[in-house]
């Protein structure tokens, strides 16, 4: 399959998720000429803001954070070489749910309260429009248990299946996605990245053992080397300035909790549906489009 023929769709919950988990993958395939689409389910209105400059944007104050984060997402995707952002059923249709048990999760517009048939139909429409060869979203736990990530997993899984059938006829002609992946963090790779951290801002701290989410190495099916685009990934992280701070080294970042994390140079995935392409000696793919033909 030629690079220009490749089509990749990523479904993420909030602005910044696309860069933190899959930024290198987006940049790598975009740089190779693939058509990369990022579909974001909410505006991230409930995000915790870093610093005082944007503190008044939060939900309890001006409630303007979501609109501001559209601009951050646009800048991040530009840094990664991807197309302009797309939002599920249009920007603002679904609101960031925050965490389970918080007042924001009870909002009728919260993504966690979405009518599943409506949300699935909206993803089906995008799949049938762009006809991706590869779709990526989260694993069943949403990576770290956030309800919006879990919801994104559920609706994307249902949509990939439904898009190949006669369901939702109003959403276009059926399309069967050849390969469907979950984005994950490999445990040993994360541990090596943390061990390599030697300097970081004095108000940051190293994570406690097991504090950052990861999966067993044996669960990983696919490893994408993103060293060649790591600077683009760092620039995209910096674009999400209300949520992310990149260390002066350019090799680490932290969220509002000031827990330092490595900017990983290999991004990992689990093939959830489809056929594994060619693998290396470790049994892992090195190309999301491996085994596919135009």
UniProtKB/Swiss-Prot annotation:
This is 1D-myo-inositol 2-acetamido-2-deoxy-alpha-D-glucopyranoside deacetylase. InterPro entries: GlcNAc_PI_deacetylase-related, LmbE-like_dom_sf, Mycothiol_biosynthesis_MshB. Binds 1 zinc ion per subunit. The keyword Repeat does not apply. Coiled coil: none annotated. Catalyzes the deacetylation of 1D-myo-inositol 2-acetamido-2-deoxy-alpha-D-glucopyranoside (GlcNAc-Ins) in the mycothiol biosynthesis pathway. Its cofactor is Zn(2+). It catalyses: 1D-myo-inositol 2-acetamido-2-deoxy-alpha-D-glucopyranoside + H2O = 1D-myo-inositol 2-amino-2-deoxy-alpha-D-glucopyranoside + acetate. The keyword Metal-binding applies. It is an enzyme of class 3 (hydrolase). Its EC number is 3.5.1.103. It comes from Rhodococcus erythropolis (strain PR4 / NBRC 100887). Keywords: Hydrolase, Metal-binding, Zinc. One of its GO terms (biological process) is mycothiol biosynthetic process. One of its GO terms (molecular function) is N-acetylglucosaminylinositol deacetylase activity. Zn(2+) binds at residues 14, 17, 149. Belongs to the MshB deacetylase family.
